[in-house]
Amino acid sequence: IGYAVRRWCLKRRRIFTTSYHTRFPEYLAARLPVPVDWTYAVLRRFHNGGAGCMVATASLEAELEGRGFRHLMRWSRGVDADLFRPDRRSAEIADLPRPIHLYVGRVAVEKNIGAFLDLKLSGSKVVVGDGPALDALRRAHPEVTFLGARVGEALADIYATSDCFVFPSRTDTFGVVMLEAMSSGVPVAAFPVAGPRDVIGDTGAGVLDEDLGRAVEAALMIPRDHCREVALRHSWRAATQQFLDNVVAAQKGCAASALV
């Protein structure tokens, strides 16, 4: 669909923008023997045809710029703070041994979930999400509570009932699930890589460490109200305004180029 719309716009000289959400080159390389540089070349050609390419973080912007992507614009993410809040509770996991360590997301090889499930932690591990690796992980880790996919209030209840959100991915461009956890008053433990570095950084709402188990233990000491406070800086209103500003800037940029 993206290529079809791109062709339509280029043929009719219509201004358009794109957005870069997923590390397709790395995801593809994790499954098939396709060189990362090949896939980036295809994506670079696609995105450089537009008047602007929106990216979620400073880290991703710098990386793509180094790979030859042009007209990059920052477009951060927002969280529904009315839905994801600390006062909720989930009957599904409330009686599990504490602390409850939570993962939410696609259950697939590129998410590096094994790094979380292999940790020796007290309490319980809960995985929310579906994906191609779900059945295999269920068999390999019978001690883990796999809930499958959850959305809306059921998901929000699970977040708020947990004690630590573990984000083991090394390839996500942002990780909005971290914002959802923080908005629910839950601290984050993650690796110090792009994505977590941009969302957590030095906010104190989580801990980044190459030793993920050590990050979890430290994150459990973070006050829940501080996590909520940090998440509230990422509103849907602010994200929407940033998107609209980018669209206007792209239009003005093309108009200025036409005058040269």
Describe each region flagged by the PLM:
Residues 40-89:
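Donor nucleotide-sugar binding/catalytic pocket of nucleotide-sugar-dependent glycosyltransferases
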Residues 170:
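Aromatic "clamp/platform" in nucleotide-sugar-dependent glycosyltransferases that forms part
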Residues 92-126:
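Conserved donor-binding/catalytic core segment of Leloir-type glycosyltransferases
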Residues 89-91, 221-255:
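A charged, aromatic-enriched C-terminal amphipathic alpha-helix characteristic of glycosyltransferases
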Residues 178, 183, 187-190:
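Short hydrophobic beta-strand element within catalytic cores of glycosyltransferases
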Residues 47, 149, 157-162, 243:
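Short alpha-helical donor nucleotide-sugar binding micro-motif in glycosyltransferases
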